[in-house]
């Protein structure tokens, strides 16, 4: 059932609840008159606590049947409509984000959000709405990936500019035999 149909059903329930509340006392009186028989009348004269217990039980059952179930259903339906609207809004934002960034693997981004993003940052991102939410995740994702790739590039460049001896290849210990090494002089 779509959101519009649920909203129509919710409005119908609200009208039914308003009508039931307006005529509740009169309808309950009619219900009790119909429900009253000799046994109930005898209870009134012989065992007043049992009589009132019966009346209140009937009243609670009547309220549940006529009002409480409808109110509960209306509240559930209202919550369901809100969840559907939120999900629809998130889907719209997701599509706008994917249209803006078609190169992004959304599943990878979602996995990053769920598993790798620190809780402190996740809390801040959760406060954002719309496409800004997805943009913030992408920014952190790109920042983390750039940080991981930088050391690899730097280390390769760093080693390639050094002479072979500094890299540790081909260094001979013979040149330092006459205590030329500062660490072994004393």
Curated annotation (Swiss-Prot):
Residues 2-30, 63-85 form a coiled coil. It comes from Helicobacter pylori bacteriophage KHP30. This is Coiled-coil domain-containing protein ORF13. The keyword Coiled coil applies. Keywords: Coiled coil. The keyword Coiled coil applies.
């Amino acid at each position: 059932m779509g959101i519009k149909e649920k909203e129509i059903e919710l409005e119908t329930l609200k009208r039914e609840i308003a009508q039931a509340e307006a005529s509740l006392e009169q309808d309950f009186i009619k219900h009790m008159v119909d429900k009253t028989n000799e046994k109930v009348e005898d209870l009134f004269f012989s065992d007043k606590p049992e009589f009132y217990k019966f009346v209140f039980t009937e009243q609670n059952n009547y309220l549940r049947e006529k009002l409480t179930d409808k109110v509960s259903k209306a509240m559930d339906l209202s919550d369901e409509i809100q969840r559907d609207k939120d999900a629809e809004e998130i889907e719209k934002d997701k599509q706008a984000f994917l249209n803006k960034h078609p190169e992004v693997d959304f599943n990878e981004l979602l996995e990053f959000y769920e598993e790798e993003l620190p809780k402190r940052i996740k809390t801040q991102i959760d406060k954002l709405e719309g496409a800004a939410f997805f943009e913030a995740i992408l920014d952190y994702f790109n920042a983390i990936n750039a940080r991981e790739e930088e050391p690899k590039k730097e280390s390769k460049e760093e080693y390639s500019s050094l002479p072979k001896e500094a890299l540790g290849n081909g260094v001979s210990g013979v040149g330092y035999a006459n205590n030329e090494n500062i660490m072994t002089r004393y």
